[in-house]
Amino acid sequence: MQRINREESFRAKEERLKDLFVRGLSGNNAAYQTFLGELSSYLRAFLRKRLIRLPDEVEDLVQEALLAVHNQRHTYDPSQPLSAWVQAIARYKLVDLFRRRAIYEQRNDTLDDGMDLFSSADAEAAEARRDLNKLLADLPDHFRLPIMHTKLEGLSVREAADVSGMSESAIKVGVHRGLKALAAKIRGAL
């Protein structure tokens, strides 16, 4: 019995909204304003059920759906139930919201997810620095200093010569022979 009352109540609301909407389409501004007010309550309830975990999005989505109903009012077929047409529009707006959120979340991963990437990159860089320092420590100064100044510190050959007190050609030869010695040492370690 209670179910019958609910169905009758729903049908009565459906007919009332439909009547207001059709009168509004005919130019009755007061009926259209009343329709939009009552429809917003209907949409709010409809969307609140579907956005339990996103309650902050309900009002924005109600406004988007109302705007879509207004913009698409010319597509409504009066021989069809108004609620089905409105719910279809609201569902499309709901899907749009979920797509926007998915794209946003995909583009904006939380920092916690990326912290492992940064920490492993830092750890790998520290290991590489340590290994390189061990390799360079075994080289004589006339090989080690030119490599450190030009390859690690980014100095030009002239700047490296000024800093180390060596000639520019000695810097070039030192870098070449030092890298060759490092390559041989690494090959021997493998």
From Swiss-Prot:
Region (Sigma-70 factor domain-4): 130-182
Domain of life: Bacteria
CC per GO annotation: cytoplasm
Location in the cell: Cytoplasm
GO biological process: DNA-templated transcription initiation
SUPFAM superfamilies, per database record: Sigma2 domain of RNA polymerase sigma factors, Sigma3 and sigma4 domains of RNA polymerase sigma factors
Location of the region described as Sigma-70 factor domain-2 in the Swiss-Prot/TrEMBL record: 34-102
Description of the deletion phenotype: Growth inhibited by 100 uM chlorite during aerobic log-phase growth, no expression of the SigF regulon (Dsui_0156 to Dsui_0159). Growth of a double sigF-yedY2 mutant is completely inhibited by 20 mM chlorite.
Residue ranges: DNA binding: 157-176
Swiss-Prot/TrEMBL keywords: Cytoplasm, DNA-binding, Sigma factor, Stress response, Transcription, Transcription regulation
Main localization, broad class: cytoplasm
Intervals of motif Polymerase core binding: 60-73
InterPro entries with a match to the protein in the record: RNA_pol_sigma-70-like, RNA_pol_sigma-70_dom, RNA_pol_sigma70_r2, RNA_pol_sigma70_r4_t2, RNA_pol_sigma_r2, RNA_pol_sigma_r3/r4-like, WH-like_DNA-bd_sf
Single GO term (MF): DNA binding
Induction notes from the record: Part of the SigF regulon, induced by chlorite under auto-control. Part of the probable sigF-nrsF operon.
Quaternary structure and interacting proteins, as annotated: Interacts transiently with the RNA polymerase catalytic core formed by RpoA, RpoB, RpoC and RpoZ (2 alpha, 1 beta, 1 beta' and 1 omega subunit) to form the RNA polymerase holoenzyme that can initiate transcription.
The family this protein is said to belong to: Belongs to the sigma-70 factor family. ECF subfamily.
Function: Sigma factors are initiation factors that promote the attachment of RNA polymerase to specific initiation sites and are then released. Extracytoplasmic function (ECF) sigma factors are held in an inactive form by a cognate anti-sigma factor (NrsF in this case) until they are released. Regulates expression of only a few genes (Dsui_0154 to Dsui_0159) in response to (hypo)chlorite, conferring resistance to reactive chlorine species (RCS) during oxic growth.
Protein name stated in the entry: ECF RNA polymerase sigma factor SigF
Source species: Azospira oryzae (strain ATCC BAA-33 / DSM 13638 / PS) (Dechlorosoma suillum)
Gene: sigF
